[in-house]
């Protein structure tokens, strides 16, 4: 089965956290509540689960499948699954399970060995080809930060973007020189490719070049990010700057932390403060943040009028 390649992600695509019960099980009721709240905002185009914000690699295969199936049933926007398996055959099997569970597309993570060692020329292209041809899952090209060896050079991005089955890119290169150089070329060579920023901590800087956002930040400030997207598309810098500045204390409290992985914990604390989650339980290797950090997040949300 091959799915629709015409998904419209031109707007906000939040990456929901995965709520857990206090004893550590996936809390599908809480996830449905979160997903329904997010999908209820006009301008939310999809929900992207099982990635970093969603602790997707911390879930068993059975939990991943159940999470896709239950969220798909709960919301009326497409559910997109993170595909994180290390080997290509493993990723294809993961993609097949995602399709069977109801996912409409896949956010394709690089093979994580590449983070340290880099990749052989042609290997990323083969990963995307196999996932689409063998699982029928439409693919989002995921550009990792420039600081890793798993980020793709421009030629690799262009080749993947031109492959059948690839309809969008989530770009998190976090190098503005490369962003300013590569995004215009991707746009010129692939005019139908939907370009989404995932620079949670650099949204203003990337807002004027994109079709939308695919961000964990969307968990906690969906209305504000939809407003930011509209300002970016209108090339209204003053309006975009106003949203950015209003959210800046939240951005700092959630994402300007010692490790970007702490952002997931901070997102859950923010959702707790907003009354969307009852608690902020995470799975190892994530650990709880301090009471002082939680208070910092609460005060930041208050300053942005989010609570």
Task: State each model region's role.
Residues 145-251, 255, 259:
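Catalytic alpha/beta core domains of metabolic enzymes, predominantly
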Residues 73-77, 102, 135-137, 162-165, ...:
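Short helix-capping segments at alpha-helix termini
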Residues 2-151, 287:
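Active-site beta->alpha loop and helix N-cap motifs at the rims of alpha/beta catalytic domains
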Residues 31, 68, 91, 128, ...:
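A general structural signal for well-ordered alpha-helical segments in protein cores
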């Amino acid at each position: 089965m091959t799915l629709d390649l015409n998904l419209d992600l031109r707007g906000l695509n939040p990456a929901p956290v995965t709520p857990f019960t206090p004893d550590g099980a996936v809390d599908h009721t809480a996830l449905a509540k979160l997903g329904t709240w997010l999908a209820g905002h006009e301008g939310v185009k999809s929900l992207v689960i099982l990635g970093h914000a969603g602790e997707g690699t911390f879930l068993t295969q059975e939990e991943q499948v159940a999470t896709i199936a239950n969220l798909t049933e709960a919301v009326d926007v497409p559910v997109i699954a993170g595909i994180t398996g290390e080997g290509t055959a493993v990723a294809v099997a993961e993609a097949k399970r995602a399709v069977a569970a109801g996912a409409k597309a896949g956010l394709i993570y690089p093979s994580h060995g590449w983070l340290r060692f880099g990749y052989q020329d042609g290997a990323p292209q083969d990963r995307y080809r196999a996932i689409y041809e063998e699982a029928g899952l439409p693919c989002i090209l995921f550009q990792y930060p420039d600081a890793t060896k798993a980020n793709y050079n421009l030629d690799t991005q262009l080749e993947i973007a031109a492959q059948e089955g690839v309809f969008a890119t989530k770009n998190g290169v976090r190098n503005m020189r490369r962003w300013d150089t590569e995004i215009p070329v991707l746009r010129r060579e692939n005019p139908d490719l939907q370009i989404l920023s995932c620079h949670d901590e650099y949204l203003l800087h990337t807002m004027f070049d994109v079709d939308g956002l695919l961000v964990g930040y969307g968990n906690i400030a969906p209305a504000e990010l939809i407003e930011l997207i509209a300002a970016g598309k209108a090339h209204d810098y003053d309006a975009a700057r106003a949203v950015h500045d209003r959210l800046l204390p939240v951005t700092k409290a959630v994402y300007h932390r010692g490790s970007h992985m702490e952002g997931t914990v901070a997102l859950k604390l923010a959702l707790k403060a907003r009354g969307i989650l009852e608690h902020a339980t995470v799975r190892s290797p994530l650990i709880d943040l301090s009471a002082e950090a939680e208070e910092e997040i609460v005060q930041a949300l208050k300053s942005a009028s989010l609570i």
